[in-house]
Curated annotation (Swiss-Prot):
Residues 54-57 are annotated as: Interaction with HCFC1. This is Host cell factor C1 regulator 1. Keywords: Cytoplasm, Nucleus. The lineage of its organism: Eukaryota, Metazoa, Chordata, Craniata, Vertebrata. A motif (Nuclear export signal) lies at residues 88-97. Interacts with HCFC1. GO terms for cellular component: cytoplasm; nucleus. Transmembrane segments: none annotated.
Amino acid sequence: MILQQPLERGPPGRDPRATTGVTLGLDTREPLHKHFLSEENMATHFSRLSLHNDHPYCSPPVTFPEALPPLRSPCPELLLWRYPGSLIPEALRLLRLGDNPSPYYSASPAGEIMEL
């Protein structure tokens, strides 16, 4: 059982008792209203909930124009890209030692080679 004070109508964000300057004690307030929570009430509440966008508070779906034109001939090739941040330690080593730089996309160690 949940006990709750009745809602008071008035300007939003202001307590109507604050304008009159009257402070009421617990014994002079209006009686608390009882809200009984039962399994039936909860089942009814949850059965009304929905995961679909069929409620009036949902706006209709918006379609956006495509950012890229559709591909004329899509190809199944895979582009492997290596994050350039992994080359920072190599660049620092080259700056310290003055070595000749290796090719930008050098062969990876055997553990990193992938076959498709």
